[in-house]
Swiss-Prot record:
InterPro entries for this protein: CAF1P_plant (IPR044599), RNA-binding_CRM (IPR001890), YhbY-like_sf (IPR035920)
Function: May be involved in the splicing of group IIB introns in mitochondria.
Residue ranges occupied by any CRM domain in the UniProt entry: 143-241, 263-359
GO molecular function ontology, one term from the record: RNA binding
Family matches, as PANTHER family: CRS2-ASSOCIATED FACTOR 1, CHLOROPLASTIC, CRS2-ASSOCIATED FACTOR 2, MITOCHONDRIAL
UniProt-listed Gene3D superfamilies: YhbY-like
Keywords: Mitochondrion, mRNA processing, mRNA splicing, Repeat, Ribonucleoprotein, RNA-binding, Transit peptide
Protein name as catalogued: CRS2-associated factor 2, mitochondrial
């Protein structure tokens, strides 16, 4: 006979037995614990797979990559001009007085070009290649475009949302840009070039080097926007081979742009002109990476009435200020007197002053 207390305990004992059976089944299926005390039980250890042997395809890609770094034979190009980093912003007549890196380090890479690098340019072999290149350029351009054809191309490529656009910055017409232009010419008849910064001081120079180095023709020019046409008979399969520069070479060291005493002046007069320029109001305020197509004309016009001109180049950068001064020296022409706190002081020069005086007092022809 069961007592009431036993009746109350019987369901509890049955539940305990059932729980023990479930626990035994769970322990049977549970993986044995790891011996390593650093293992975290909530996470499952993945089996370590042995490293796979490199496939033949991957090995071939590595060999090709190694070949691109140091090819078995150096590349050669039939282009008749010397290879430089920038064609429009450097002048072959400028001779450096030193280099910031050894000249044996060619920016084309070790053993990748058959032209020796002298620290400034990779000179081409002198021969009769220039005449042949000019003849081939005329053949590629073909017959001149009609006005209707020019208008159609301009309407297609002149807009700002054009996908065939190349931005030309303070580096000017660079060597690798020539390859970019030919890449666009594979699928487009023309390419839109947007020019900004220091090179816009001389747009004629940019147009000349674009046509001379690529073989195309500028069919549209509006302020700083150019459209470069490839030619009627252009064949992408016969494009010239252009070895690419792998890095930008360090600029050589050139003589000082500003002398302590300007030519034809004394030290006191030079100092007086510098103070006069600093205390005068600026002729123009130039912005960084702006469009400077009208700066040369405005400086020339100002020199008709004043002797010293100041240009405010705040936030332009000291490097760009000196580049602007070099271009204005050759284009105006004038004499840079001072570069201080991103301010450019220009003097019209003694020769120009004497010419203006002689013209003022010269008798009129009878």
């Amino acid at each position: 006979m069961l007592l009431p207390r036993d009746l109350l305990l019987l369901p509890w004992r049955r539940a305990t037995a059932a729980g023990e059976a479930i626990a035994r089944r769970l322990n049977h299926h549970r993986a044995p614990p790891f011996s390593d005390p650093d293992d975290d039980p909530p996470f499952t250890r993945l089996a370590e797979r042995p490293p796979r042997a490199p496939s033949k395809k991957k090995k071939k890609e590595e060999e090709d990559q190694g070949g691109r770094i140091r090819p078995p034979e150096p590349a050669s190009s039939d282009l008749p001009f010397d290879f430089r980093y920038s064609y429009s912003e450097t002048d072959p007549a400028w001779r450096p007085i030193g280099f910031r890196e050894p000249t044996r380090f060619s920016p084309f890479g070790p053993g990748r070009l058959d032209r020796p690098w002298d620290g400034v340019a990779a000179a081409a072999a002198r021969g009769e290649g220039a005449g042949a290149a000019a003849t081939s350029r005329e053949e590629v351009l073909g017959e001149p475009l009609a006005e209707e054809e020019v208008a159609q191309l301009v309407e297609r490529y002149r807009h700002s949302d054009c996908s065939r656009q190349i931005n030309l910055g303070k580096g000017g017409v660079t060597h690798n840009m020539i390859d970019d232009i030919h890449n666009h010419w594979k699928r487009a008849e023309a390419v839109r070039i947007k020019c900004l910064g220091v090179p816009t001081l001389d747009m004629d120079n940019i147009c000349f080097h674009l046509e001379d180095k690529t073989g195309g023709k500028v069919i549209y020019r509006n302020i700083n926007i150019l459209i470069l046409y490839r030619g009627r008979n252009y064949d992408p399969k016969q494009r010239p081979q252009i070895p690419l520069m792998l890095w930008k070479p360090l600029a050589p060291i050139y003589p000082r742009l500003v002398q302590n005493v300007a030519d034809g002046l004394t030290f006191e007069k030079t100092k007086e002109l510098r103070n006069t320029g600093l205390n005068s109001s600026p002729l123009m305020k130039l912005t960084r990476n702006g469009v400077y197509v009208n700066v040369v004309d405005r400086v020339r016009e100002a020199f008709k009435t004043v002797e010293v001109v100041r240009l405010d180049c705040s936030h332009v950068g000291s490097s760009d200020c000196k580049k602007i001064g070099v271009k204005l020296r050759d284009l105006v022409p004038c004499v840079p007197l001072l570069f201080k706190d991103e301010q450019i002081i220009l003097w019209r020069g003694k020769v120009k002053q004497e010419n203006s005086v002689s013209l003022q007092f010269s008798p009129e022809p009878s």
